[in-house]
Amino acid sequence: MIELKDGRIVAGERVVIGDLSFVAPAGKVTCLVGQRGCGKTLLVRSLLGLWPLEKGFATLQGEPVTRLSAPWLRRLMVYVPQELPDSLSDALDVLDEGLATGRRAVVADDPFVAMSEERALLLANRLQALAGEGRAVVVACSEADVSHFDPTATLVCQIENPSIRQS
């Protein structure tokens, strides 16, 4: 499970996301949805312990992310960054390599960018299968990308500056 409790994310002087809370349970895909520039990438970085929260805390399996060392976080979580050079094959390689070591959570930052519909569906199916195996899967994506996932196994958190709503 990945959780964010009362988190506030600031960039410079601007509150990007304010006072947000959500739970990404094991067994579900949780989509963090919002328009470009709304703070999805900063939110992902905060979940990974790479961007500080001005307020609140993020936890992974009940442990505050800020108390976990970077090597320990890498043992617990697979991160699929937005900037992968060769889209689908690299995204799947990152997943497979990370999961071979027993990691229990996946966080992906806009992984469908520049992918064809067919490739996006393949990646979404793989992420959905990982959730079905009991992993917490968090995907920052656009509203259109949510359609790649089975709605009965997906939670959607709509990001609206400076807040978030979970449905």
Predicted regions and their residues:
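Conserved beta-strand
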Residues: 4-7, 15-25, 56
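ABC nucleotide-binding domain signature
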Residues: 31, 71-83, 87
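Conserved catalytic loops of ABC-family nucleotide-binding domains
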Residues: 126-140, 147
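The feature captures the beta-strand-to-loop junction immediately N-terminal to the Walker
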Residues: 33-35
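Helix-to-loop junction immediately C-terminal to a conserved catalytic motif
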Residues: 48
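Conserved lysine of the Walker
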Residues: 40
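Short coil-to-beta microelement around the adenine-binding A-loop and adjacent beta1/P-loop entry
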Residues: 14-15, 71, 121
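Conserved ABC transporter NBD signature motif
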Residues: 56-64, 73
